[in-house]
C-alpha cells in the first residue's frame, strides 16, 4: 500500500463494490482506514516526517499497523491480496498474509508477478492464487455464492 499507486485505492474500491453487490460481504479497506488516521495531517508533511521527525512518523504508522492487524485477526473472514511489484518495497502486505495464514483465514492472492518472483512463503500461505480479478470473482462466487450468477 505504501508504495502502490494511490495506495491501491482503485482496485480495492472496485472489489469492495463487487463484494457488496454480489456476495453481500462487507470490507475492511486499509486505504480508507489510513485516510481516517491521516485526516488531521497533511500527507506531504507526514511523508517528510520519515526523515524529519521519525519518532512522530513511527507513532502514526504503529497506529495503522495495530488497526490493520486487528482487522485481519479479529474481523476478517478472509483476505484478498494483490501481489505485484509494489510489495517488494513494503512489509505490511507480507505481514497481513502471514497473520491471516497463522489465524486460519483464507487468503485469495491475485498474483501479478512471474511465478519465480513469487515468494515461496507467500505462495504457501495463499489458499487460492489467481492471475486477475475476474478469476478471483469466479473463485469467490463459487465459494460464497454457490456459483449463482453475478454481475
Model-derived regions: residue spans:
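Conserved catalytic or regulatory cores that recognize and/or transform ribose-phosphate-containing ligands
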Residues: 1-151
Amino acid at each position: 500500500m505504501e508504495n502502490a499507486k494511490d495506495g491501491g485505492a482503485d482496485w480495492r474500491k472496485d472489489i469492495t463494490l463487487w463484494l457488496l453487490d454480489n456476495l453481500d460481504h462487507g470490507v475492511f479497506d486499509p486505504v480508507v482506514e489510513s485516510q481516517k488516521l491521516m485526516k488531521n495531517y497533511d500527507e506531504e508533511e507526514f511523508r517528510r516526517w520519515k526523515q524529519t521527525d521519525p519518532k512522530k512518523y513511527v507513532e502514526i504508522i504503529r497506529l495503522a499497523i495495530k488497526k490493520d492487524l486487528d482487522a485481519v485477526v479479529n474481523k476478517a473472514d478472509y483476505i484478498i491480496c494483490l501481489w505485484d511489484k509494489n510489495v517488494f518495497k513494503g512489509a505490511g502486505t507480507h505481514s497481513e498474509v502471514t497473520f491471516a495464514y497463522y489465524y486460519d483465514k483464507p487468503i485469495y492472492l491475485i498474483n501479478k508477478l512471474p511465478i519465480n518472483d513469487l515468494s515461496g512463503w507467500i505462495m504457501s500461505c495463499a489458499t487460492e492464487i489467481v492471475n486477475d480479478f475476474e478469476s478471483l470473482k469466479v473463485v469467490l462466487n463459487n465459494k460464497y455464492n454457490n456459483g449463482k450468477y453475478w454481475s
